[in-house]
C-alpha cells in the first residue's frame, strides 16, 4: 500500500472533521469549536475540537487523531498475533454530541483506519466505524429517519450490509450490567478489509458523510420544543448510562486508557453534567417509561411507517 493511499485517507478524515464542525456550529448558532492540537511522544498527534455551552449543544467534541509506532502494545496483539513485530498507523475521526435539550438525542460517530506494516510482507489493514443514537425521550419518526438514512447509505454496498451492521451496533452498544441498550443503535463495523481497499474506503466515507444527514434533521425538528426541570433531571440520569458504557465496556476507551493515549481526548465523550439515582423507576405510562418499553428493546425500524 502506497504512502499516497494512506495520505488520501488522512485527507478525507481531516476534511470530514472540518465539515462536521462547521455544520454543527451553524446548527448551534451561538458557540464555536475551540481547537487543541497535540502531539504524541511515540509518534503522531491530532487535533481535538470542543464546543461548549452552546444554545443547542451543551457540549460537542470532534476529534481527529493520527498515531503511529514501531510496535504495537501486547494488549493489541494478544488476539491478533499476525500484528506482532509490525509498525503501525491508526487514524480516525470520533465525535460525541451532548445536546442541551432532553428532546434531542445524544449521538456518537466515528470512522477509522488502521495499518500495520513489516518489511517484505503484505500490510495488514482495516477500516472501522459507525454511528449510533441515544435518545432520552423517544420519537418514532426520528428513529425511523435515523435507520432509513443508515439503510440508504449502505444500499450501494449490498443488501446485507445494513442488517449486518445494524445488528452489530445493537450487540455492541449494550450495557451488560444493566441488561439494556445504550440507545436505538445505528451502524457499527470493524475489521473491514474485503472485498478490496477502494470499496472499504468508499463505504467508510459514506458512513462518515452520512452522519449529519441522519442527525441534523432530528436536531432541527426538536430544538424548539420546550422542556423543564423534570425532563432535564431524566436527561442527566440517562447520561449516567452513557458514562457507564464508555468506562466499563467501550473497547476504544479502554484501549486508549490502557495504552497511554491522550486522556483529555479519550474522555472527550463524557457529558459535562450527569447524575445517578438509586433504584430509579419511571412512572407507569409516562414518557420516561416509554423509552424503556418502546425504544431501548431491539426493533426493526425499517418496518415502521416514515
Curated annotation (Swiss-Prot):
Cofactor or coenzyme needed: a divalent metal cation
Site (described: Important for dimerization): 177
Descriptive protein name: Oxygen-dependent coproporphyrinogen-III oxidase
GO MF term list: coproporphyrinogen oxidase activity; metal ion binding; protein homodimerization activity
InterPro entries: Coprogen_oxidase_aer (IPR001260), Coprogen_oxidase_aer_sf (IPR036406), Coprogen_oxidase_CS (IPR018375)
Ranges for region Important for dimerization: 242-277
Keyword field: Cytoplasm, Heme biosynthesis, Metal-binding, Oxidoreductase, Porphyrin biosynthesis
Pathway: Porphyrin-containing compound metabolism; protoporphyrin-IX biosynthesis; protoporphyrinogen-IX from coproporphyrinogen-III (O2 route): step 1/1
Family: Belongs to the aerobic coproporphyrinogen-III oxidase family.
GO biological process: protoporphyrinogen IX biosynthetic process
Compartmental location: Cytoplasm
Keyword Amino-acid biosynthesis: no
Primary site of residence: cytoplasm
Complex formation: Homodimer.
UniProt xrefs under Gene3D superfamilies: Coproporphyrinogen III oxidase, aerobic (3.40.1500.10)
